[in-house]
């Protein structure tokens, strides 16, 4: 029997090809969202609607399974702790607290301070910040708000 290299190959010779690589994950931006413990929509919705090259990363802040002014205020330090758990070895470009009522109750300054504590260097925002900027851009003058909360 002939050595392996002397046998004719059953496979055609392949061409040498230069691989093409994409730009990598999150080449446009890495965005972090801080969610309530019981949140059920933001993470999947943001991942579904994110443009190509934008990575969506989420962490949940602990909170009682009842939304009230007291439970929202109580989660303040949990916001920064949760932000620190998102990609701890990589810099986020943007970090967002994804709770409109929580941002109003806690206050944007305190929310942003917590986001900065957990994700220093990331641009901070919240859902209410986005809403206010959108209303300003639309020059909205009369606004009606409906919420599912009793207090």
Located regions from the model:
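Gly/Ser/Thr-rich loops at beta-strand to alpha-helix junctions
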Residues: 35-40, 99-107, 148-151
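Conserved beta-alpha
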Residues: 111-118, 122-151
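N-terminal glycine-rich anion-binding loop in soluble enzyme alpha/beta folds
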Residues: 2-81
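Short glycine-enriched loops at secondary-structure junctions
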Residues: 39, 51, 100-102, 128-131
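Residue-level preference for short coil/turn positions at secondary-structure junctions
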Residues: 27-29, 91, 120, 139
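Glycine/small-residue-rich loop that forms an oxyanion/phosphate-binding "nest" at active or ligand-binding sites
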Residues: 79-127
């Amino acid at each position: 029997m002939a050595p392996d290299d002397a046998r004719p190959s059953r496979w055609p010779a392949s061409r040498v090809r230069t691989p093409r690589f994409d730009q990598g994950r999150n080449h446009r931006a890495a965005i972090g969202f801080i969610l309530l413990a019981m949140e059920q929509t933001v993470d999947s919705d943001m991942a579904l609607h994110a443009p190509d090259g934008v990575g969506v990363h989420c962490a949940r802040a602990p909170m009682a399974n009842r939304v009230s002014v007291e439970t929202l205020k109580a989660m303040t330090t949990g916001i920064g702790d949760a932000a620190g758990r998102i990609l701890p070895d990589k810099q986020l470009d943007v970090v967002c607290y994804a709770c409109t009522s929580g941002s109003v109750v806690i206050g944007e300054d305190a929310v942003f301070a917590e986001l900065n504590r957990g994700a220093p260097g990331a641009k901070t925002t919240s859902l209410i910040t986005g809403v206010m900027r959108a209303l300003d851009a639309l020059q909205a003058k009369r606004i009606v708000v409906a919420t599912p909360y009793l207090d």
